[in-house]
């Protein structure tokens, strides 16, 4: 069995000394963990009570949080003619048709954050399924990434739009803030996301939808919050059973 690092020991000591993981304590708790030398993300993991083997219970979508987490994104657009021109004007890093496909095939280490496609270009994109699919980069109409409104989609991405989907265990992982956010900024973002998420609850799913919510920093430990109390205090219903 491997030895616990000094950093992990410190995190465990802090967590074991705490008895109250209410939201208002979270920023101070996360800030008390050993820090990295950069402005770490604050990530959320949300365990959902869904059956991932049923296609109608899988959750995916996109959202722009009130307090944006903007960062530079490498955006690839599959389009031609005027749509290609619009893509570059809106800030795409790479746009085109077959030439873009060839570049991706020949440089599999290319760090791409988002791929957008016009409907007409999808036959080219589909041939890249084995490369883009495992990275979660395939354009999808539910996410708005198959569109003729290229400029608007790029604008949303650059404004901090987050894409999310559950993994095979029914857990959604995404970022809701930075370690330099204050308590109110983080609270607003988490509330906004949870309220949005509750509205995506499958119609055939009865009872509790959200099972567990935990927050963590990029390099630190995670803390489970009392999400039922948090939701109720802010008048968000998850059909919580008493």
From Swiss-Prot:
Keywords: Repressor, Ribonucleoprotein, Ribosomal protein, RNA-binding, rRNA-binding, Translation regulation, tRNA-binding. Pfam families: Ribosomal_L1 (PF00687). One of its GO terms (biological process) is regulation of translation. It comes from the Bacteria. One of its GO terms (cellular component) is cytosolic large ribosomal subunit. GO terms for molecular function: rRNA binding; structural constituent of ribosome; tRNA binding. The keyword Secreted does not apply. SUPFAM superfamilies: Ribosomal protein L1. Part of the 50S ribosomal subunit. Binds directly to 23S rRNA. The L1 stalk is quite mobile in the ribosome, and is involved in E site tRNA release. Belongs to the universal ribosomal protein uL1 family. PANTHER family: 54S RIBOSOMAL PROTEIN L1, MITOCHONDRIAL, LARGE RIBOSOMAL SUBUNIT PROTEIN UL1M. This is Large ribosomal subunit protein uL1.
